[in-house]
A protein has these predicted regions:
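Short, charge-rich amphipathic interface segments used for partner binding and complex assembly
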Residues: 29-56
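N-terminal acidic leader/helix
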Residues: 1-26
Length: 56
């Protein structure tokens, strides 16, 4: 794996974790149960703008 590929992979991983944490927190604060908040976290990851991440 090249340095560029590794850097991109780390960037995507960080963005996924950040999106999931924010999605879970927002859902929990809105009163969703653990399961609902987890689903919201996964949806937040699915909605990431991957093109923007790749462009930098």
């Amino acid at each position: 794996m090249t340095e560029e590929m590794l850097s991109l992979a780390e960037k995507v991983r960080s963005a996924c974790i950040e999106a999931a944490l924010r999605g879970y927190e927002r859902a929990s604060l809105s009163g969703l149960c653990h399961e609902g908040a987890w689903e919201a976290a996964i949806d937040a990851v699915r909605q990431l703008d991957l093109e923007a991440l790749v462009r930098g």
